[in-house]
């Protein structure tokens, strides 16, 4: 383990193609795309971990080490992070608005993942740590006006996050901020807004709005139904991000100083 004093004064060397990159939630949509992104850039040591059995992973990248691990368990996080230079935590129990409204306890339990992963990354001597947060961390009062303005990072406070899922994200963000301030582990946080694209979930309740709308339109055409059901009245403004832009942004935010 690198000492706290050394962490605080040491300048990071450039990430080598042989440095170990660990991706929690690598069997999921964004995690799998991130593994492919780094593989395509020529990184030779990539380890991904996910609680889903391997046949259920969204995509598997040739040459990437794949571990079937439940990262809400501390020892599994230690195993996943061993030897890591950079750790990306995209593991979470989450889905679309229907899922996070119905299964708040499951969403809240994801705080265990970040608690154990960031500590395991720190103990393993990782230089940098990424956490995938969400727009649900923002104050819900900002979502009442259909003429919504672009949000700043500071708009999450005063805090009134989405119940369950949003609060889990906000407190996990605080973990990241304090690990950097107190222990010198460089952390980066991104609040995702409706990421979509190839290999994304499109049914089962965990899908986001773009995939859900596409599925409903196709089903309506197949069944001959003239209408589909959507949430809300169509007036709120929504933000969407394509998966390629998302993983590029993760890479950039982790490696900008």
Predicted regions and their residues:
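NAD(P)H-binding glycine-rich loop region in Rossmannoid oxidoreductase-like domains
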Residues: 64, 68-111, 120-123, 140
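Conserved Rossmann-fold NAD(P)-dependent oxidoreductase catalytic core, especially the SDR/UDP-sugar
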Residues: 89, 115-162, 188
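Short-chain dehydrogenase/reductase
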Residues: 107-111, 161-173, 203-211, 239-240
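Alpha-helical substrate-binding/gating segment
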Residues: 181, 195-198, 210-228, 238-257
């Amino acid at each position: 383990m690198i000492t706290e004093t050394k962490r605080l004064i040491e300048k990071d060397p450039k990430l080598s193609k042989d440095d170990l990159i660990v991706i929690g939630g690598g069997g999921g949509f964004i995690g799998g795309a991130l593994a492919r992104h780094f593989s395509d850039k020529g990184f030779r040591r990539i380890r991904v971990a996910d609680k889903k059995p391997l046949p259920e992973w969204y995509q598997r990248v040739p040459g990437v080490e794949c571990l079937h691990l439940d990262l809400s368990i501390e020892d599994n996080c230690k195993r996943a992070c061993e030897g890591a230079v950079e750790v990306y935590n995209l593991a979470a129990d989450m889905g679309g608005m229907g899922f996070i409204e119905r299964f708040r306890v499951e969403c809240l339990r994801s705080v265990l993942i970040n608690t154990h992963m960031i500590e395991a990354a720190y103990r393993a001597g990782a230089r940098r740590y990424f956490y995938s947060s969400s727009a649900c961390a923002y104050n819900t009062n900002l979502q009442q006006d259909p003429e919504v303005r672009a949000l700043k990072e500071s708009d999450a406070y005063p805090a009134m996050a989405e119940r369950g899922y949003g609060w889990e994200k906000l407190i996990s963000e605080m973990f990241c901020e304090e690990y950097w301030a107190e222990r010198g582990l460089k952390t980066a946080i991104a609040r995702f807004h409706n990421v979509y694209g190839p290999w994304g979930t499109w049914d089962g309740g965990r899908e986001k709005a773009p995939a859900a709308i596409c599925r409903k339109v196709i089903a309506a055409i197949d069944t001959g139904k003239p209408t589909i059901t959507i949430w809300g009245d169509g007036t709120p403004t929504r933000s969407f991000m394509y998966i390629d832009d998302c993983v590029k942004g993760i890479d950039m935010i982790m490696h900008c100083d």
